[in-house]
C-alpha cells in the first residue's frame, strides 16, 4: 500500500505478505528512491538508500508474523488474511500443509500456495438464495453454480453465506443445491451440494480453509451424477 502525507511517501507491506510481494515492494521502493532523487529511507533506525534497499531483511518480520498466525489458528477455527484479489482463509489443516516442509523451503511453500489462490484462472461461484413459501413458512434454498467446462471455486461447506444470515434469520434453510451449468448458461444437472462434493474422488483440491477448486466435469462424470 502506498500513501503520501504531503511530505513523504510511505510503502506499507503486510507482515504476512509473500516473498514475491516483499520483493516487488522493495523493487518499487528502489524505483521511487531513484525517481525522487532521494537517498535515504529509515526502518527501525536503520538507513537504506537506492543501492541497499533490496538488502532489507523481511524474513524475520515474516517468520514472527507466521508464528503468531500459528498460535491464532489454534484459538480460532478460521483466520482471514488479506489477499490481492480475494481474502485467504487459513485453519490449522491448511497452514500445516504450507509449513510442514524443510526450513529452506518454507518461504517458497508459503509463496506458492498463497499466490495460487490469487492468480488462479477459475470461475468463482457466488451463492444465490431463493425464498419460497410452503404452508405459510418461508423456506430458503441456497444455490451455487458450477461451470462444467472450466475450473470452479466452490465453498467447501454447504452453508448459508454470512451476508445472508441476518437477512434470513429465523427462516428454515433447505438442503443447499448445486447447479452444473455450461458456459452458455444451460443447466446440465441439479444435485444436493454436499452429496456432490463428497462424490468427488479426484479433480477437487483444497484452495484454502473455506474453498475448494473443482476441475471441469467430464461427460462420463456428468452422466454418472445425472443418474443419481
Which residues fall in each region the model found?
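Aromatic/basic-lined ligand-recognition segments
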Residues: 54-179
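Acidic, low-complexity cytosolic segments
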Residues: 21-46, 50-53
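Extended, charged low-complexity segments
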Residues: 163-228
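Short, intrinsically disordered low-complexity segments
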Residues: 1-23
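Short, flexible helical or helix-coil boundary motifs
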Residues: 36, 73, 204-207
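Generic surface-pattern signal
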Residues: 34, 71-75, 227
Amino acid at each position: 500500500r502506498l500513501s503520501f502525507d504531503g511530505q513523504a511517501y510511505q510503502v506499507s507491506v503486510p507482515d504476512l505478505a509473500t516473498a514475491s510481494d516483499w520483493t516487488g515492494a522493495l523493487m518499487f521502493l528502489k524505483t521511487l528512491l531513484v525517481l525522487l532523487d532521494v537517498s535515504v529511507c529509515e526502518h527501525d533506525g536503520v538507513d537504506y538508500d537506492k543501492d541497499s534497499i533490496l538488502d532489507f531483511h523481511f524474513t524475520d518480520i515474516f517468520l514472527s508474523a507466521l508464528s503468531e498466525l500459528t498460535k491464532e489458528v489454534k484459538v480460532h477455527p478460521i483466520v482471514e488474511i488479506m489477499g490481492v484479489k480475494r481474502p485467504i482463509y487459513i485453519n490449522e489443516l491448511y497452514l500445516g500443509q504450507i509449513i510442514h516442509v524443510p526450513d529452506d523451503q518454507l518461504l517458497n511453500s508459503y509463496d506458492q500456495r498463497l499466490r495460487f489462490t490469487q492468480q488462479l484462472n477459475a470461475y468463482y461461484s457466488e451463492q444465490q438464495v431463493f425464498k419460497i413459501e410452503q404452508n405459510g413458512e418461508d423456506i430458503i434454498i441456497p444455490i451455487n453454480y458450477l461451470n462444467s467446462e472450466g475450473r470452479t471455486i466452490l465453498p467447501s461447506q454447504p452453508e448459508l453465506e454470512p451476508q445472508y444470515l441476518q437477512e434470513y434469520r429465523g427462516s428454515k434453510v433447505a438442503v443447499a443445491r448445486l447447479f452444473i451449468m455450461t458456459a452458455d448458461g444451460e443447466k446440465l444437472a441439479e444435485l444436493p451440494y454436499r452429496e456432490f462434493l463428497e462424490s468427488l474422488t479426484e479433480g477437487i483440491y483444497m484452495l484454502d480453509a473455506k474453498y475448494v477448486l473443482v476441475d471441469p466435469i467430464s461427460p462420463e462424470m456428468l452422466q454418472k451424477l445425472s443418474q443419481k
